[in-house]
């Protein structure tokens, strides 16, 4: 990424009310928390912990009056953990990605399948874009009703590279799904690549928002 491109990303992040350090700190803390998991935890626990703690960090810091003015809002409706901009202009959720997270020369998709509610949110992103409305149409107050479903949703995508162990991240706005996977984006803002988080975060990282979880049952001797 060139210097001018990096400057454009920084400017766009500022418009969205966030900065790279927030996301870097969130992922670092999530990694530290996930590393506490052991072989006695459920097989997917490290991935779930990493996902949950990343979203928790964003929520705790963006809703803290000592760190943010005005504060953001938070909701876990439909099992989709979201922080909502004070104006109600957009929301952000952290999910794992796959492909080329952070590399605009490569395609990227959500790592894990998404359910009916997420599919509707992605579709609403496209409708909002086509309507010609700006991303920053202010509201005096966000009521978590229909407004939450219609506001643009951004993904903080993260991915661990299996070859060198680096953790890459980007902030992107989804616009289309293929099957249960988000694979097309209106905007992609590369953030950074960081050192190995020290664990496999490529496992299931969130409950399906349709409410049905699948568990593999193995017979032991």
Where are each of the predicted segments found?
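Short N-terminal edge-element motif at the start of the domain
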Residues: 37-40, 46-69
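Catalytic cores of nucleic-acid endonucleases
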Residues: 99-162
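Interdomain/boundary linker segments immediately adjacent to catalytic/signaling cores
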Residues: 1-49
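Short secondary-structure capping micro-motifs at structural edges
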Residues: 44-45, 68-70, 77-81, 102-107, ...
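Glycine-rich, aromatic-bearing surface loops/beta-hairpins
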Residues: 140-221
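Short, solvent-exposed secondary-structure boundary motifs
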Residues: 60-64, 72-73, 144-148, 161
